[in-house]
Amino acid sequence: MIISTSRFGQVELKQEDVLTFTEGLLGFADLRKFVLLDDPNDEIFAWLQSCEAPAIAFPVLEPELFAPQYKATLTKGDMEALKLTAQDKARYFSIVTIPDDPTLMTANLKAPVVVNIEARTARQCVLQDNNLAIREPIFTKLQQRVVQNPAVAIKNQSTGIDVATKLHVVRDAEL
């Protein structure tokens, strides 16, 4: 299948690449079909792209990349909605906000996007832990990670466990 995106143009996907949200993202309740795109030209972010609205895409990161002690505890309702039997079958992604000044970028640790790897279901879960920030500053943390481990990529390649889809942009000649 081919979807239109405002960021990447036409993108080719397989049906099994699509993540179905049990409820839409906060503020985007009507959008239920997304794909997690891994752009090889972007060393930091993956993109949570709507399959239904070309202009809707969010940069995301796995929270462990900038918050090594990050621990998400899902409610029973979250587990049921995601069809999860164990939390270790889930992957967590923080939506990142990047303002004009990228040094002020933040990540939402309080309401991660949780993906059931096997069922291909997803949900933005609002966690009960009041110590988690909605706007966690991450620029300095990402910088420190690069300085400490320059040979290790920042972005965890979730494609190895079939969460993210390698970006395949469809060129005019392929249409």
Swiss-Prot record:
User: Which keywords appear in this protein's UniProt record, sorted alphabetically?
Assistant: Bacterial flagellum biogenesis, Chaperone, Cytoplasm, Translation regulation
Q: What does it do?
A: Acts as an anti-CsrA protein, binds CsrA and prevents it from repressing translation of its target genes, one of which is flagellin. Binds to flagellin and participates in the assembly of the flagellum.
| InterPro entries (UniProt xref) | Flagellar_assembly_factor_FliW, Flagellar_assmbl_FliW_dom_sf
Question: Per the UniProt entry, what are the Gene Ontology biological process annotations, in alphabetical order?
Answer: bacterial-type flagellum assembly; regulation of translation
Q: Which family does it belong to?
A: Belongs to the FliW family.
The cross-references to HAMAP family, in alphabetical order and at most eight, read: FliW (MF_01185)
Q: Gene encoding this chain?
A: fliW
Top-rank taxon, per record: Bacteria
**What is said about its interaction partners and assembly?**
Interacts with translational regulator CsrA and flagellin(s).
Where is it mostly found?
cytoplasm
Q: State the GO CC annotations.
A: cytoplasm
- Compartmental location: Cytoplasm
Looking up Pfam families in the UniProt record yields: FliW (PF02623)
Protein name as it appears in the record: Flagellar assembly factor FliW
